[in-house]
């Protein structure tokens, strides 16, 4: 079903209207399928029940909870079937385990790829990561800030760069999130990926991961859980148009 040989072009971190993305699951699938992606991971937010950002004035903040998770997973799996038939694109479900805190050194997000059961973050990010890993997910430390400035309010998530114990729970680390580089990840020699953290259509461009793995979910999750090397590429408008 693949249109081109070689490593798989992946978006490992993407959001829909189930949390804070602008597109439905179907729209997300069509955009990435038409643009030549081989793998799309749908990873909407789950936040703790007392998350402070829920109550920001004017904030649009939705997230997955234990009640909505079966509906979310069902929609992603239906769209995964259509994506494979229509585009030869693999769609993998997951969640972004989201532990926000006003103190950046306590805040951390982890993308759980291949997760098919609900995981709460009410017990803390470390417990959530352990639970997701035990369920078979690949865990990617998302936008792991070192000393970089925040690109927008509420985005500083520094705990991975400060907490060696938490780092040990992640299989991979975002070296690039969109166009933002987290240099400490490379300096520490950590297994890296690049993702778009897709919320809006213009996030289709930017740094992405090319994965030298078999084109099925089990192989992709297994590869991401390992320290094996990946390729990183920057996707520009011309390449997106050429792939479509």
Question: What kind of region is each of these model predictions?
Answer:
Residues 1-15, 25-30, 101-116, 130, ...:
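Charged catalytic cores and adjacent phosphate/nucleic-acid-binding surfaces used
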Residues 1-93, 97-98, 126-129, 202:
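An N-terminally biased module of ancient metal coordination in phosphate/nucleic-acid-related enzymes
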Residues 40-42, 140-141, 174:
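Conserved beta-strand positions in the central sheet of alpha/beta enzyme cores
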Residues 45-46, 144, 198:
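Short, ordered loop/turn segments at secondary-structure junctions
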Residues 91, 139-140, 192:
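Hydrophobic beta-strand scaffold residues
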Residues 107, 133-137, 141-144:
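Internal, conserved structured core segments that host functional sites
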Residues 117-122:
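Short helix-loop capping/hinge motifs at secondary-structure junctions, enriched
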């Amino acid at each position: 079903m693949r249109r081109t040989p070689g490593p798989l072009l992946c978006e490992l971190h993407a959001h829909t209207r189930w949390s804070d993305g602008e597109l439905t699951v179907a729209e997300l699938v069509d955009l990435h399928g038409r643009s030549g992606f081989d793998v799309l991971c749908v990873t909407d937010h789950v936040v703790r029940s007392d998350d402070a950002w829920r109550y920001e004035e004017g904030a649009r903040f939705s997230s997955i909870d234990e009640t909505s998770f079966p509906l979310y997973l069902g929609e992603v799996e239906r769209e995964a079937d259509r994506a494979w038939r229509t585009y030869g694109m693999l769609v993998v479900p997951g969640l972004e385990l989201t532990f926000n805190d006003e103190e950046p050194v306590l805040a951390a997000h982890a993308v759980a790829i291949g997760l098919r059961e609900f995981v709460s973050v009410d017990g803390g990010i470390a417990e959530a990561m352990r639970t997701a890993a035990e369920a078979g997910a690949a865990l990617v430390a998302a936008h792991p800030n070192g000393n970089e400035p925040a690109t927008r309010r509420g985005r500083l998530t520094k705990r991975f760069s400060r907490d060696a114990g938490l780092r040990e729970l992640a299989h991979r680390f975002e070296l690039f999130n969109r166009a933002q580089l987290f240099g400490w990840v490379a300096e520490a020699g950590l297994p890296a990926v690049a993702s778009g953290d897709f919320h809006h259509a213009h996030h289709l461009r930017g740094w992405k991961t090319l994965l030298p793995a078999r084109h099925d979910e089990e192989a992709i999750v297994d590869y991401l859980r390992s320290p094996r090397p990946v390729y990183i590429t920057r996707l520009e408008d011309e390449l997106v148009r050429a792939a479509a």
